[in-house]
């Protein structure tokens, strides 16, 4: 007897319309509750949290409601002497939070708030001989960090600062027989890693190295009867994979292979009608992370109330056009 498929049941009274105003209110109020338990406990990822909040507000046309000057001052205070940027004041710098900070500054057209040359040197210093990147000085290797490195440098116009050819070699060595990618060579394919690797290959103009049909099949297999997407086989659906899977399909030109209407219904069902925001699954607690990726997923599905989102950088297309960064996509 086969393993029962893991999925959720969407109730008949689940939300089926986009509650855009409530989502904007939810994000706008989130950062003002600095004494809340949830806010205090998320300090270790604060920089990414700000990126999630600002990006979703920009996609909804509500960026003006956020405190620009406070955010810029915070980012400036998080850059270390080594050039790297930390999640919060007093924390260690990391490539992930460095990318989040650069994305925020690009949104605000304020990249001069930080020392760009030091950021470039920091990223360059994390590349290893095999082309891979560590996330920080402690040395964890992961294809996520390869993406963070090239995305950061591309936004800064400094991609030539690293050994791009070796970086490409490492990412391609993480490609699996099923067309997907893992965090290191031989690791299991996972939608989050696939997003990072296809995004990396888009930035470095190497998408011709991907078997788009094989990978597209694997990604479409992530859709469950509920319409939601999971990150790998035998897992429950999660709104965040409405981004990781869908953006990957967009990058490789296979977005039309998914059942768009069923996915849209799943995403909408994950809204909280009272507080605003999106949860991972219908009925769960909402948070800014899932709110961004729910809204960004709906943008990829063509939701007209939301600005077009770039599938590689998860930023509004208009922002990438302003800074003249246009990664290659498969048509």
Curated annotation (Swiss-Prot):
N-acetylglycine carried by residues: 2
Catalytic activity, reaction form: geranylgeranyl diphosphate + L-cysteinyl-[protein] = S-geranylgeranyl-L-cysteinyl-[protein] + diphosphate
Notes on how activity is controlled: The enzymatic reaction requires the aid of a Rab escort protein (also called component A).
Annotated binding of geranylgeranyl diphosphate, by residue: 190-192, 241-244
Residues the record lists as Phosphothreonine modifications: 3
Entry's EC annotation: 2.5.1.60
Classification via InterPro entries: PGGT1B-like, Prenyltrans, Ptb1, Terpenoid_cyclase/PrenylTrfase
Any one biological process term the GO annotation gives: protein modification process
Gene Ontology terms, MF aspect: Rab geranylgeranyltransferase activity; small GTPase binding; zinc ion binding
Pfam families, per database record: Prenyltrans
Cofactors demanded by this protein: Zn(2+)
Enzyme class, broadest EC rank: transferase
GO cellular component, as recorded: cytosol; plasma membrane; Rab-protein geranylgeranyltransferase complex
Record text on cofactor binding: Binds 1 zinc ion per subunit.
Start-end of each PFTB repeat: 20-61, 68-109, 116-157, 164-205, 212-253, 260-302
CDD domains registered for this protein in UniProt: GGTase-II (cd02894)
Binding sites annotated in the UniProt record for Zn(2+): 238, 240, 290
UniProt KW keywords: Acetylation, Metal-binding, Phosphoprotein, Prenyltransferase, Repeat, Transferase, Zinc
Oligomeric form and interacting partners: Heterotrimer composed of RABGGTA, RABGGTB and CHM; within this trimer, RABGGTA and RABGGTB form the catalytic component B, while CHM (component A) mediates peptide substrate binding. The Rab GGTase dimer (RGGT) interacts with CHM (component A) prior to Rab protein binding; the association is stabilized by geranylgeranyl pyrophosphate (GGpp). The CHM:RGGT:Rab complex is destabilized by GGpp. Interaction of RABGGTB with prenylated PTP4A2 precludes its association with RABGGTA and inhibits enzyme activity. Interacts with CHODL.
Family, per entry: Belongs to the protein prenyltransferase subunit beta family.
Function summary: Catalyzes the transfer of a geranylgeranyl moiety from geranylgeranyl diphosphate to both cysteines of Rab proteins with the C-terminal sequence -XXCC, -XCXC and -CCXX, such as RAB1A, RAB3A, RAB5A and RAB7A.
Protein name in the entry: Geranylgeranyl transferase type-2 subunit beta
């Amino acid at each position: 007897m086969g393993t029962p498929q893991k999925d959720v049941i969407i109730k008949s009274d689940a939300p089926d319309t986009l509650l855009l105003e409530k989502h904007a209110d939810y994000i706008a109020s989130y950062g003002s509750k600095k004494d809340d338990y949830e806010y205090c406990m998320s300090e270790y990822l604060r920089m990414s949290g700000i990126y999630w909040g600002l990006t979703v507000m920009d996609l909804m046309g509500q960026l003006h409601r956020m405190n620009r000057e406070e955010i810029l001052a915070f980012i400036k205070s998080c850059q270390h002497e080594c050039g790297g940027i930390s999640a919060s004041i007093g924390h260690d710098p990391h490539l992930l939070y460095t990318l989040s900070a650069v994305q925020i500054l690009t949104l605000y057209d304020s990249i001069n708030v930080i020392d760009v040359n030091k950021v470039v040197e920091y990223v360059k210093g994390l590349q290893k001989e095999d082309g891979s990147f560590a996330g920080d000085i402690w040395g964890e290797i992961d294809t996520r960090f390869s993406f963070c490195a090239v995305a950061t440098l591309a936004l800064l116009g400094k991609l030539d600062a690293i050994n791009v050819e070796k970086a490409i070699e490492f990412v391609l060595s993480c490609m699996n027989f099923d067309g997907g990618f893992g965090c290191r060579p031989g690791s299991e394919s996972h939608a989050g890693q696939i997003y990072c690797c296809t995004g990396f290959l888009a930035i470095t103009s190497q998408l011709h190295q991907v078997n788009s049909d094989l990978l597209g099949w694997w990604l479409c297999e992530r859709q469950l009867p509920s319409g939601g997407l999971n990150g790998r086989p035998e897992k429950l659906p999660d709104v965040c994979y409405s981004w990781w899977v869908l953006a990957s399909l967009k990058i490789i030109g296979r977005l039309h292979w998914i059942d768009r209407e069923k996915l849209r219904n799943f995403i909408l069902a994950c809204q909280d009608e009272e507080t605003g925001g999106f949860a991972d699954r219908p009925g769960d607690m909402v948070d800014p992370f899932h709110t961004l990726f729910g809204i960004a997923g709906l943008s990829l599905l063509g939701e007209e109330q939301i600005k077009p989102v770039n599938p590689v950088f998860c930023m509004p297309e208009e922002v990438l056009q302003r800074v003249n960064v246009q990664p290659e996509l498969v048509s």
